[in-house]
């Protein structure tokens, strides 16, 4: 989930900063605000209703369907790894389909926070004197954002990623409860 949030959130925040107060910025801010402000348990319930009950695109609650639950021996107690060890490819696909929605929702929460903060840090960098000098030298706005401002904002962005990881551990408890997933939330 943190990988999804970082791989999508940082470029989304950079695009929002590059096109500040224009359509891509407004759309990106709406997506990041939705991911950051909506409760994770509500997103989980809506995701289950839409993508599992109505569309049937993902697996439902639990780690596996009942048909596969007892066919896979528990070696590591991590279903994806246990199904690979057992060579049960259908069970692997089933376990992966059960993992997609919870991981995506946690990734959406991480994406929202990382994108908002990346945009904020980059807008601050774009107001600095060195970006004015780069503009006067004729460098394009995208080159300034992606080559210079993003590099200078990397320190605060890495700090936010670490804080997001801690925030996701908190959200994992609710996500695991909604999706009946016995994970790290049982131990916290």
Q: Locations of the language-model features?
A:
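Membrane-water interface segments at the C-terminal ends of transmembrane alpha-helices
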Residues: 31-64, 70-82, 105-111
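Alpha-helical transmembrane segments of integral membrane proteins
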Residues: 1-24, 40, 71-187
């Amino acid at each position: 989930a943190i990988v999804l949030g970082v791989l999508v959130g940082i470029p989304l925040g950079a695009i929002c900063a590059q096109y500040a107060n224009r359509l891509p910025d407004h759309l990106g801010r709406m997506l990041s605000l939705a991911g950051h402000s909506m409760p994770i348990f509500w997103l989980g319930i809506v995701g289950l209703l839409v993508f599992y009950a109505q569309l049937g695109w993902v697996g439902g609650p639990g780690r596996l369907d009942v048909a596969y639950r007892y066919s896979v021996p528990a070696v590591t107690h991590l279903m994806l790894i246990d199904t690979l060890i057992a060579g049960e490819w259908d069970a692997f696909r089933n376990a992966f389909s059960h993992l997609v929605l919870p991981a995506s929702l946690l990734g959406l929460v991480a994406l929202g926070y990382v994108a908002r903060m990346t945009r904020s840090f980059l807008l601050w960098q774009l107001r600095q004197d060195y970006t004015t000098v780069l503009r006067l030298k004729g460098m394009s706005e995208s080159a300034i954002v992606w080559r210079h401002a993003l590099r200078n904002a990397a320190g605060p962005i890495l700090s936010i990623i670490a804080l997001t990881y801690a925030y996701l551990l908190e959200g994992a408890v609710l996500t695991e409860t909604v999706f009946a997933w016995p994970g790290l939330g049982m131990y916290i």
